[in-house]
Amino acid sequence: MKGTGGVVVGTQNPVRDYNHSTDEEYQRLRRLADEAYKKRDQLSHESQTAYQQGDKKLAHELSEKSKAQLKTAEDFNMQAAEYVFVENNADSSSNEIDLHGLYVKEALFILQKRIKFAIDHNEPQLNVIVGKGLHSQNGIAKLKPSIEEFCAKHGIRNHLEKGNSGVLVLELQGVQMQMDGPAVNAPTNQYNAQPHPQYNNNGGQPQGQAQNYNNSGNDNKDSTLTSIFKIFCNCIQSLA
């Protein structure tokens, strides 16, 4: 049986043929997010111009519209993250997690929760599918080095799966992660930047200085990514 993304599920040896880089729905959601960021930037620029010209009322109106576009962009990115995560993990075994198609902050946020789950359930290893960076800008992988850095920070030994440089094997025996405060914050409105991030081309590593409008959406984003993780937990528990 195939999932909507072309993943064969329900077999003993599932075939991995889902590719987010050619998935029209995934690309549509990321593209809509990118377009909303561009609108946000334009409205922000117009707001600043109006303010400098002394029209504070117009500046405020444009600023509010800019904030609305920011929320729209973030919503589309969260939809894309949920969509690609579910598609990629439809055929994942209970000791692996596929982070293809997630931006770095999305991936790290979900990964830290998955590691905590593994530790709590005495799982000795976790296979993290990160890919080889073939779809990243200039073919430079972003997920793998970011996850290796995360592991180094938390004392998690890791190595590449033999014969597969797109899979990091995390050794979790004896690992104790302090999770009282999040090791990785949920993606917030600071995942974007001024100028707007070219998400479709750089794998979700925005460059530049973030413009911080407000933090009112942080809890919603935390909740959304937690929900994505819970979907994954349900999948692996069904395999147990």
Swiss-Prot record:
Q: Which InterPro entries match?
A: DUF1771, Smr_dom, Smr_dom_sf, Smr_domain_protein
Please list where the region (Disordered) is annotated. 1-24, 181-219
Give all residue intervals belonging to the Smr domain.
97-173
Q: What top-level class of enzyme does the UniProt entry assign? A: hydrolase
**What EC designation does it have?**
3.1.-.-
The biological process GO terms on file are: nuclear-transcribed mRNA catabolic process, non-stop decay
Q: Name one GO cellular component term.
A: cytoplasm
Lineage: superkingdom: Eukaryota
Q: Does the keyword Transmembrane helix apply?
A: no
Q: Which UniProt keywords apply?
A: Cytoplasm, Endonuclease, Hydrolase, Nuclease
Q: What is the documented disruption phenotype for this protein? A: Impairs nonstop mRNA decay.
One of the record's GO molecular function terms: endonuclease activity
For whether the record's keyword set contains Hydrolase, the answer is yes
Where is this protein found? Cytoplasm
Give the Low complexity compositional bias ranges: 194-215
Q: Which SMART domains match?
A: DUF1771 (SM01162), SMR (SM00463)
What the protein does comes down to:
Endonuclease involved in nonstop mRNA decay via the formation of mRNA cleavage fragments in the vicinity of stalled ribosomes.
- UniProt-listed PANTHER family: SMR DOMAIN-CONTAINING PROTEIN YPL199C
Other comments? Present with 2130 molecules/cell in log phase SD medium.
Name by which UniProt lists this protein: Endonuclease NBR9
What's the name of its gene? NBR9
